[in-house]
Design a protein with these regions (language model features):
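Short glycine-enriched, charge-decorated loop/helix-capping segments at active-site entrances
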Residues: 74-75, 193, 233-236, 296-302, ...
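Conserved SAM/AdoMet-binding glycine-rich loop
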Residues: 102-104, 111, 121, 213-337
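Short, low-complexity intrinsically disordered segments enriched in A/P/G/S/L with frequent Arg
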Residues: 5-7, 11-16
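Conserved, mostly hydrophobic/aromatic
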Residues: 204, 221, 257, 285, ...
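Contiguous mid-protein beta-loop-alpha structural module that forms a pocket-lining wall or clamp
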Residues: 334, 341, 350-351
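Terminal RNA-binding accessory module
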Residues: 369-468
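Short strand-connecting beta-turns/loops that link adjacent beta-strands
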Residues: 63, 181, 290, 415-416, ...
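Proteins enriched for Cys/Gly/acidic motifs involved in redox and nucleic-acid/cofactor modification
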Residues: 17-229, 268, 279, 283, ...
Length: 468
């Protein structure tokens, strides 16, 4: 797969799918391209497991398979454009006879089902996220010349199941909930994914234990909002208790939290993060903005003062924590003063990690029809200003780490740079930096934890030397 579970009662029965032409006896092959977030990645991994159980041969390169699946993202305009580009590239290969069937699924297919069917006739099958459990039957029908269109209720999206993991063996993502109830004015996720649904804690702990037994050292918890985990369960389960149970699993070394909603951060959660050694001192806390007026228009709570107090409390209760946030600029009605306040806030707080999006006008959201839409050029200008400021902040923070010895999860060797690389607790996969280090007389292995003395910060990556 580029960037899983047993069949449930009443689902499509297990069967093996073979070619019925000159290659009699050879199983059909399937390749998948999964776009977007880590939640989409987990969905793709479960689909691949179902396909493998059904007898399909999985290929890393979708372009070389009998059937190609594009697991699309429909969050913002740039993500939709990337999804369409991938579909058209595969459609070209299909026209050339290099693949037999093209299947489109995921968030964009769920959200724009009519448009996808009308504008992308090259797709042999189009299915929504609730159809993931029946993906093997959908692919079979597409390969046999049918054009299935399957859009069950969103709530039928499997919350758990066997997976063909696409990450390295030493880390993986674990989805603890699906859907969202927050209803932010700019976001289409509740329309696409449905209401918030927590997984049962026993099933999460069981899967985590199985992952640890398979060699996973770093477990990254994900959901649209991890901090609201358990609010829909009747047994009183909440995130702090789930974390305590996960920390008791042998073999796990790091547990990382992504997507923490600011108004759901509790003292109990912070105390667990501070006391449990396996929970890395890192929190992904998407704030979006600090202006009270902009946040109110976004249907989000808070103000600059309240967010400043929250961050001060987090840093006081969890010393040394690394905070990653995401900001949005160019929301309808964002004035020059609002934007300047955001820049001042980011400069004052000095987030260790910060990403920024330009507002994307998404159909069906409350923000789509709002007045005072801001021109795209101005949105991009504001984004660039904030990110340029943040680069300086992150560089200075990195320089302040020089001389520290940190634990690094080794990920590989860069033969061009002539050194090893990995991640510290301050670095989430794919979105943050890396630690590049030399190892005189030693040969670290991927998946090991080693001590590295930090010697330099270069473009927000750290350089260092192996010391243990």
């Amino acid at each position: 797969m580029r960037q899983g579970r047993s069949r449930h009662k009443g689902g499509v029965p297990r069967r093996n799918y073979y070619r019925m032409d000159g290659d009699v006896g050879m199983a059909y092959s399937v390749g998948m391209i999964s776009l977007g977030c880590e939640k989409n990645r987990v969905d793709a991994e479960m689909m691949m497991a179902r396909l493998r159980e059904a007898g399909f041969v999985l290929k890393d390169d979708a372009a070389g398979a009998d059937a190609a699946i594009v697991n699309t993202c429909g969050f913002i305009e740039s993500a939709k454009a990337e999804s369409i580009e991938e579909i058209l590239e595969l459609a070209k290969l299909k026209k050339e006879g290099k693949i037999r069937a093209l299947i489109v699924t995921g968030c964009m297919a769920e959200r724009y089902r009519e448009e996808v069917r009308r504008e992308l006739p090259e797709a042999d099958a189009v299915c929504g996220i609730g159809a993931d459990g029946d993906i093997a039957e959908i692919v079979r029908r597409a390969l046999e010349g049918e054009h299935p269109e399957v859009f069950p209720e969103k709530e039928k999206l499997p919350l758990e199941g066997k997976r063909v993991r696409s990450t390295p063996p030493y880390y993986t993502y674990l989805k603890i909930a699906e859907g969202c109830d927050n209803r932010c004015a700019y976001c289409a996720i509740p329309m696409i994914r449905g209401p918030y649904r927590s997984r049962e804690p026993e099933r999460i702990v069981q899967e985590a234990a199985e992952l640890a037994a398979s060699g996973v050292k770093e477990l990254i918890l994900i959901a649209q909002d991890v901090t609201r985990y358990g609010k829909d369960l009747h047994d009183g389960s909440r995130l702090p208790e789930l974390l305590r149970r996960l920390c008791r699993i042998d073999g796990l070394r790091w547990i990382r939290l992504l997507y923490c909603y600011p108004d759901a951060i509790t003292d109990e959660l912070l105390d667990v993060m501070a006391s449990e050694k396996k929970i890395v001192k890192y929190m992904d806390l998407p704030l979006q903005h600090c202006s009270h007026e902009v946040l109110r228009a976004m249907h989000r709570a808070g103000s600059r003062g309240e967010l400043t107090e929250l961050i001060a409390k987090i840093r006081a209760r969890v010393p040394g924590i690394v905070l990653r946030t995401t900001m949005m600029v160019g929301f309808p009605g964002e004035t020059a003063d609002d934007f300047n306040e955001l820049c001042e806030f980011a400069k004052e707080i000095k987030f260790e990690r910060l990403g920024c999006f330009a507002f994307s006008q998404e159909e069906g959201t409350d923000a789509y029809d709002m007045e005072d839409q801001i021109p795209q050029e101005e949105k991009e200008r504001r984004r660039d200003i904030l990110m340029e400021q943040q680069q300086t902040i992150m560089q200075r923070w990195g320089e302040s780490r020089v001389g520290q010895t940190v634990e690094v999860l080794v990920e590989g060797y860069d033969r061009y740079a002539g050194c090893w690389f990995g991640r510290s607790a301050a670095d989430a996969p794919e979105v943050d930096g890396r630690v590049f280090f030399t190892a005189q007389g030693g040969k670290p292995r991927a998946g090991e934890f080693r001590k590295v003395l930090l010697t330099e910060c270069l473009d927000c990556d750290m350089l260092g030397e192996l010391v243990g």
